[in-house]
Amino acid sequence: MMTFQNRFVLLLGLAALLAVISLSLQFFRLIPLPVGFYGEEEAKPRKRVLIDGLLKAPQALDPITESVYYCNRPNGSVQGLEGHAPVGFKLEAAHIMIRHGDRYPLYAIPNAAALNIDCNIRTDRAPFHRALEGFVAHMAQAREGRFDGPLAGFPLLPSHPRCEMGQLTQTGVVQHLMIGQHLRQTYSDLHGLLLKHESESERVRAAYVESTGRARTLQSALALLYGLRPAFDWSRLRVHHQPSASYCYAACECPARSAFQELDQRRQSRARSRDPQLARAFRDMASALDVPPARLRAAVPVDPLLAHFCHGVPFPCATSLPSPPPPPPQRSGCVSEQHFRTLRAQQLVDEKERREAGLFRRFALLVMHPFLNRTAQRLGAVAAGKPAERLALYSAHDVTLEPALSALGLAGARFPRYAARLVFELWRKEDKGRLAGGADVGGHFIRVLYNGEDVTFKTAFCQNHDWKRGTGSLLCPFQKFLDFVSRDMFAPFNSTSYYEACHHIPQPDADI
């Protein structure tokens, strides 16, 4: 029989053995430890490995959650890291591309009651913003403003008691007023990109504004500009017209771009035709609304359904049903939430596959090169000390921002929601010392932000920039962006120029 002393010795030995095993596991990092256990320099790389390699793949996107994100309802305040950089850097310029704000649908569901939304701007209803009244008053003083081309014929405010197709809503106006006020805190107040009173010699500091030929993009730009600079001087404002939603300027002719777009559209069509849940949802909706399924598919019903969801309006019913429509479960002639979930789920999968597909990536590189090249030239002019606008605003669409994100290599970015923003910031090192990695004195650097998040080190041109190990700066060298635009964007086409890449036509059966 084991004595008490022997038991104590045995337990002591077991405890020592467990301690050795535990220390061994921790030495080889086979069990997790609190961040900071090994110190800051050791903890950060280990945390990155866990995120990039060992965590499980994210679950499927929830259609309702993603729809709430897409609507971007103006609740609370806008947050973001625009205008923030390490100590010792000075902001030289910021170029902002936005998607217009919330709008009325571009399509109508056949044989369904139309969505009724008031597009008048009124300060006595939601969503309200304290700058709304001043914005409306300032738009009435636009006689001295200059608007190029068709922009001169557009109203500066949405003003219909019942919205028209594609018209900006009051929600869309408030979204951009809020973004403008957020950017004002850093770009105007902190960094002085816009002076309160520009003199003739300081005209280069005025904002450059460009909009596509749609009222909703012009109105969105004006709302953001007012939030950024309340009561701006109309006599110094000129809004340039961009004829193409792709912002391709004089380089819109690109045969390969059209070919890649057609191939990607075929891929999308094949994927949708093979989705049994989507086909069932269209059959059920068509039966409820008493229309042929093919006609319903052609109407792109997810667009008007998203408008119902964003504005908290019940999904539509057949026009033959009484008004107001019957409550569930008697809504047999109506579009259901499950129909909406199915359509949105397929759309989210399609967006994800499109971002990851080589076809769309190549299309995006070609379609967005003119804009990125123009941006690089304008930022380069600022870096060289030449007369150039320090702040530029480009008002565009989802079909502009989505390929821009793909061209930059941001395959994981979410689809551009209403009032999405993509920002390019140019920074300069202020001190006179030589930068880490041998960069020139006074070197310039670039930051890329999407909806306020710094995504610079996720871009194709700077994802390999090692800022932590003394081989580079805390910011991405501007030269990397210049090299990307002038050289690296053509590499997937085995070309050395935009013209050559545009004539590198893919085979009709290509599946890259």
Predicted features, each with a name:
Residues R7-Y208, T212-A392, A396-I512:
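Signature for phosphate-centric chemistry
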Residues M1-R7:
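Short, low-complexity, Lys/Arg-enriched N-terminal segments of secretory-pathway carbohydrate enzymes
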